[in-house]
């Protein structure tokens, strides 16, 4: 992937934008930053790739759904192919027209506003990120007023049609341009674009149609999430105007560090201490995994800092089957103090090995430490 930026921000569209809006934004930006048009701008090509990548994901319903649910973690490298865009067409007089007049030309009415999106940052333990969990949270948000059912009017009364815009929410006006006179629209300042006026407001919400509440929500966290993963909960955001959908709730994950393991992508890493005798002779030891301790055989002659791999003992993949691996690095520990018997055995070992020991030479223990790369 060429970018880690928010695809919606790149195209300048909202998260509930339809395919027509997404395509229109893409064509406008692609025309603006196309490398053939901006040959003197060294940054144009990268900008064009960024725009194309955003459109490639957001124009595909399946890819867009995965991106909305998991963010960039839900998108694989093979989901994007920049070469496809070399053949895409840009053009049409309507695109140039949009650049002069901002699009729309009065064809679109505002309508009820959807609710705003919310974000909630959640810190979870390492193990919960690996295997998934369910959490209950409480968030403050606006909800539809139960007293007036979102109309904003006092029970027993109804909102009235705005006399200035006749319920359209917009008023029409004309504008003279170098191309002639054009009719355009703007939001009605009498009703604020709602198309209705409330003479007798609801006593609970004071006419807004919404109230502030503390809402308990159950969040299902899938296995494999990591710090920065974004989980989308549709329609759990702020309430929209009557007739419009709620916004979405985005759970931003932060994973707590682990005492033993470090994570890189879906692999985990840890360090296990062994004695120099175990390294030399080999041994069967217990090593930690996410599921608990397991038996592992250290082969004889193992060198310091050797890394062993346990397949499928890492983090489950977020968007598919299988898991990462666990990598175990052995740290050879040399004893700081030994009794006379232990020292004598090592001296005999040195003699058999052909190592000459005398006071003028560095001690055999120091040799062992040097051999195993420890101080």
Swiss-Prot record:
Co-factor remark: Binds 2 Zn(2+) ions per monomer.
Region (Disordered): 222-243
Cofactors required: Zn(2+)
Zinc finger (CR-type): 132-214
Organism: Halothermothrix orenii (strain H 168 / OCM 544 / DSM 9562)
Keywords: Chaperone, Cytoplasm, DNA replication, Metal-binding, Repeat, Stress response, Zinc, Zinc-finger
Amino-acid positions noted as binding Zn(2+) 1 in the UniProt annotation, renumbered to this chain: 145, 148, 202, 205
CXXCXGXG motif repeats: 145-152, 162-169, 188-195, 202-209
NCBIfam families listed in its UniProt record: DnaJ_bact, PRK10767.1
One GO cellular component, as annotated: cytoplasm
Gene designation: dnaJ
GO MF, any single term: zinc ion binding
J domain sequence ranges: 6-71
Family according to the record: Belongs to the DnaJ family.
Protein name: Chaperone protein DnaJ
Species classification: Bacteria, Bacillati, Bacillota, Clostridia, Halanaerobiales
